[in-house]
Amino acid sequence: MRRCRACGSPRLLYHSELYDLSIAHIDCDAFYASVEKRDNPELADKPVIVGGGKRGVVSTACYIARIHGVRSAMPMFKALEACPDAVVIKPDMEKYSRVGREIRTMMQELTPLVQPLSIDEAFLDLSGTEKLHHDPPARVLAKFTGRVEKEVGVSVSAGLSYCKFLAKVASDLQKPRGFSVVGEAEALSFLAARPVTTIWGVGKAFAATLEADGIRMIAQLQEMEESELMRRYGVMGQRLFRLARGIDERHVHNNDPVKSVSSETTFFHDISRHEDLVPILRSLSEKVAWRLKKSGIAGQTVVLKMKTADFKSRTRNRRLDDPTQLADRIFRTGLALLEKETDGTKFRLIGIGVSDLRDAGLADPPDLVDRQATRRAAAEAAMDKLRDKFGKGSVETGYTFRTRK
């Protein structure tokens, strides 16, 4: 690697493996905020925060806001303390999803092997695409980043390597508008100089465990035997051993299944009364059920998520006898879990979802014992038909109607 003779930039000019690498990670830069700035040029030089009201959290902060210390998932009141002049914009997920799909389509023009991680990032396997594009993957990727900014109006950062782990690490190196490469020959030395939090799965809690054992840098992991790491940290020890050496044999898949479907909301004021939480839970359950039905899937485990006024999270779950995509079953299962949590505690957030997803053909067999459940399922099916014909807000249950009072 060498620096530019004209400006001295350390950004890559030459790499011995540049035309041999084919695994890419694409990540849009401050995506939600970038879309808002694209649609309103007056925001170009202003700090922009996309997120909820004062009681919500930051979804995305533009790079100007980040200079002031604003970060994703930061409570909004703290973000505004750090950057009081920020322009706060309520998230428009429909718009972001639309832009994300546009970029995804452009990715799929490069290769059929596109593995989305979210609406604004994905892995791409560009192996074997040279004949199609008449260019090696590195050039194809560089052209792609420029095309996205020109045609869509948002910038992206790209990482190119020989494996998924290092491609993702590389895409974070020079944001925004980054294009970074990590080759196989340099992987060990590149990783050795980085903290253990670079490794997937090493969050704050596990990093603290490693630090208690005197391990802060990946170089220290590289000096340890796999057996010793597994003795100390179990299966995670094997991951530490392999990723610390740049060993990642996972392939890019374009059909990774969705693992869960959920919906949550943050309250404007803390809520402690059970009767006030019930209609909100019902409304969220209907949103989850609607998404399941539209996707042709069902979930067998219902998950209740709550966050207390002091930001402590609670997660409860219950496995059903068979998969469901009915709002009524999701709600009633969640309600049983909720009843054990409403003891006067003040909550700032509630969410409901399902995991352990299955094909919808296995969902909700007739209940031969509870005839009322069968009637409720029939009523829900009738409401679904009305919503399909007249819109989602055309018919509501008594529970959800109470939330609009």
Curated annotation (Swiss-Prot):
InterPro entries: DNA/RNA_pol_sf (IPR043502), DNA_pol_Y-fam_lit_finger_sf (IPR036775), DNA_pol_Y-fam_little_finger (IPR017961), DNA_polymerase-Y (IPR050116), DNApol_IV (IPR022880), IMS_HHH_1 (IPR053848), Rev_trsase/Diguanyl_cyclase (IPR043128), UmuC (IPR001126)
Co-factor note (free text): Binds 2 magnesium ions per subunit.
Protein name (record): DNA polymerase IV 1
Active site, per annotation: E121
Protein task: Poorly processive, error-prone DNA polymerase involved in untargeted mutagenesis. Copies undamaged DNA at stalled replication forks, which arise in vivo from mismatched or misaligned primer ends. These misaligned primers can be extended by PolIV. Exhibits no 3'-5' exonuclease (proofreading) activity. May be involved in translesional synthesis, in conjunction with the beta clamp from PolIII.
Chain's gene name: dinB1
Protein species of origin: Agrobacterium fabrum (strain C58 / ATCC 33970) (Agrobacterium tumefaciens (strain C58))
Keyword Nucleotidyltransferase: yes
Transmembrane segments: none
